[in-house]
Design a protein with these regions (language model features):
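Loop-to-transmembrane alpha-helix initiation sites
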Residues: 171-183
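A glycine-rich, hydrophobic loop/mini-helix early in the fold
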Residues: 59-114
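N-terminal topogenic module of multi-pass integral membrane proteins
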Residues: 1-72, 209-213
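Membrane-proximal helix-loop-helix units in multi-pass membrane proteins
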Residues: 101-160
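Helical transmembrane-bundle signal
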Residues: 37-47, 51, 71-78, 101-105, ...
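Short, highly charged, low-complexity non-transmembrane loops/tails of multi-pass membrane proteins
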Residues: 200-215
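C-terminal ends of transmembrane helices
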Residues: 75-89, 136-146, 194-195
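Structural signature of hydrophobic alpha-helical transmembrane segments
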Residues: 57-73, 116-130, 180
Length: 215
């Protein structure tokens, strides 16, 4: 992707299948995507801290539920504005997000326990709620593949390891806590670093999007 010229309102690039422009609207979409990731990372870190540091505090554990809801909404915003060449993959991640959100709502409404405790005590709930983290992991994979980000290279295998480890019980509580803490820390690092990445990189080659659209 090569910059050809910079008019006042848009930038013109040479893509694989022809020229394309990056407009202010494109840039705004990227900023929204990154802001969503930032809010999601912050909410995840807060939730992880409450679980790891205040597990004996009923109020703290109950507070995880609204924090998780904010995380889910922010992730949805990012999934709505992310640029992925494969439309089917993009839609699949959005469907995963929606399924996981519906499952989390069902568990939160049906369970007499706070959501965090219900998931911890009943690992089978992750068969539904886990779709949220599958969607998030799709973003990690995309960022690792496209931009060679070190933190997402650890997150891409680390997230399913923790989720599956809890579902099937092959991780100790100490290992789960360690992986959760690492996940929260790397997620924050990833989200912060995104704000310093050149915006056109997140937009990608729009000529490819246009080409695939007509296939």
């Amino acid at each position: 992707m090569q910059l050809l010229k910079s008019p006042d309102e848009s930038e013109v690039y040479q893509g694989q299948f022809g020229e394309f422009t990056i407009t202010q609207s494109d840039r705004t979409g990227v900023l929204i995507y990154r802001a969503g990731l930032g809010v999601a990372a912050l909410c995840f870190a807060i939730g992880a801290t409450l679980v790891l540091q205040q597990s004996d505090n009923p109020i703290a554990i109950q507070a995880v539920t609204p924090v998780f809801a904010c995380f889910w909404i922010a992730l949805g915003v990012s999934l709505a504005t992310i640029h992925i060449y494969m439309i089917a993959l993009h839609r699949a991640l959005q469907v995963f997000w929606a399924i996981g959100g519906a499952a989390a709502l069902f568990v939160a409404v049906q369970s007499s326990e706070p959501l965090a405790l219900a998931v911890y005590e009943h690992p089978a709930t992750l068969w539904g709620i886990g779709f949220i983290f599958a969607a998030l992991n799709g973003i990690y994979f995309k960022e690792a593949f496209c931009f060679n980000r070190l933190e997402t290279k650890f997150l891409t295998p680390g997230v399913p390891l923790l989720i599956l480890g809890h579902m099937f019980g092959f991780l100790s509580a100490e290992n789960e806590q360690f992986l959760l803490a690492i996940w929260a820390a790397l997620f924050i690092i990833f989200a912060v670093r995104k704000f310093f990445q050149p915006i056109p990189q997140d937009i990608g080659d729009k000529s490819v999007f246009e080409y695939l659209k007509h296939q």
